[in-house]
């Protein structure tokens, strides 16, 4: 299938899924969740949904479990909003790139402040 179409379908699902998670999902386990990326398979049967979840490790696991439990509801809502013959099955994956970037940024800040202290000495 055309890679451009697959990419557009992924972006559309990402946009609509973000809206549904903000406004429509009432599961208390699902906390502050951000959809960072959606990778759709070439046959449009499977969509890997990468999410960033704010909170402790325990809260992240609970939110991921809540999202997996709400998969049917989310597919139904996306089906109403996105015109596709078949809505892909969602697989939710935790996106740790934001946490990784934050760790790198804090390390760089620490190195910078150490360098400034050495310059002052």
From Swiss-Prot:
UniProt KW keywords: Cytoplasm, Ribosome biogenesis
Keyword Cytoplasm included in the entry's annotation: yes
GO annotations of cellular component type: cytosol
GO biological process, one term: maturation of SSU-rRNA
Family matches, as PANTHER family: RIBOSOME-BINDING FACTOR A, CHLOROPLASTIC-RELATED
Alphabetical list of Pfam families matching this protein: RBFA (PF02033)
GO terms of molecular function: ribosomal small subunit binding
Function: One of several proteins that assist in the late maturation steps of the functional core of the 30S ribosomal subunit. Associates with free 30S ribosomal subunits (but not with 30S subunits that are part of 70S ribosomes or polysomes). Required for efficient processing of 16S rRNA. May interact with the 5'-terminal helix region of 16S rRNA.
Chief location category: cytoplasm
Record has Cytoplasm as a keyword: yes
Localization per Swiss-Prot or TrEMBL: Cytoplasm
Subunit structure: Monomer. Binds 30S ribosomal subunits, but not 50S ribosomal subunits or 70S ribosomes.
Gene name of the encoded protein: rbfA
Family to which this protein belongs: Belongs to the RbfA family.
Name under which the protein is recorded: Ribosome-binding factor A
Family annotation (SUPFAM superfamilies): Ribosome-binding factor A, RbfA
InterPro entries: KH_dom-like_a/b, RbfA, RbfA_dom_sf, Ribosome-bd_factorA_CS
């Amino acid at each position: 299938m055309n890679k451009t179409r697959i990419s557009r379908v992924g972006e559309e699902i990402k946009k609509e899924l973000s809206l549904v998670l903000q406004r429509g999902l009432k599961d208390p386990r699902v906390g502050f969740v951000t959809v960072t990326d959606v990778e759709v398979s070439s046959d449009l049967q499977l969509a890997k949904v990468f999410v960033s979840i704010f909170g402790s490790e325990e809260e992240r696991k609970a939110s991921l479990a809540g999202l997996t439990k709400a998969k049917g509801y989310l597919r139904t809502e996306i089906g109403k909003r996105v015109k596709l013959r078949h809505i892909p099955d969602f697989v939710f994956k935790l996106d740790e790139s934001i946490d990784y970037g934050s760790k790198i940024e804090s390390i760089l800040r620490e190195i910078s402040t150490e360098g400034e202290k050495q310059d002052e000495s």
